[in-house]
């Protein structure tokens, strides 16, 4: 069984366009939330770890290639891979600590809110 799509004129005749415009006016009367979805300090932290993920492994490869491993690119590449994993583990640790601190702040705020309600 096929369904029909109603054209713009059919919707106007049915009064759906007026309902939509009334809803739009109601929404426009409210203040919109223009705050960013992610706080700036998190973006800066992510950018820092992104740069570290690029710079540290590449620099460790070239620094160890001729100075420590005397031209052995396999060991220098392994060093770069290890350093990339070190940066990754560092990011995970920082992210977990930040998540825990946000949870503690939320719990403290909730606790103060319940205490203030009890006082009233």
UniProtKB/Swiss-Prot annotation:
It is found in: Endoplasmic reticulum membrane; Endoplasmic reticulum-Golgi intermediate compartment membrane; Cytoplasmic vesicle, COPII-coated vesicle membrane. Pfam families: VMA21 (PF09446). Its main location: endoplasmic reticulum. Keywords: Cytoplasmic vesicle, Endoplasmic reticulum, Membrane, Transmembrane, Transmembrane helix. GO terms for cellular component: endoplasmic reticulum membrane; endoplasmic reticulum-Golgi intermediate compartment membrane; ER to Golgi transport vesicle membrane. InterPro entries: Vma21. Belongs to the VMA21 family. This is Vacuolar ATPase assembly integral membrane protein vma21.
């Amino acid at each position: 069984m096929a369904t029909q799509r109603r054209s713009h004129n059919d919707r106007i005749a049915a009064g759906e366009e007026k309902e939509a415009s009334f809803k739009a006016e109601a929404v426009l009367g409210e203040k919109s939330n223009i705050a960013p979805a992610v706080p700036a300090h998190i973006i800066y932290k992510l950018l820092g770890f992104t740069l570290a993920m690029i710079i540290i492994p590449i620099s460790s490869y070239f620094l160890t290639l001729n100075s420590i491993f005397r031209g052995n690119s396999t060991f220098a590449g392994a060093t770069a891979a290890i350093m990339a994993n070190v940066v990754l583990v560092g990011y995970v640790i920082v992210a977990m600590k930040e998540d825990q601190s946000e949870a503690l702040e939320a719990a403290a705020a909730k606790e103060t809110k319940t205490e203030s309600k009890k006082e009233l």
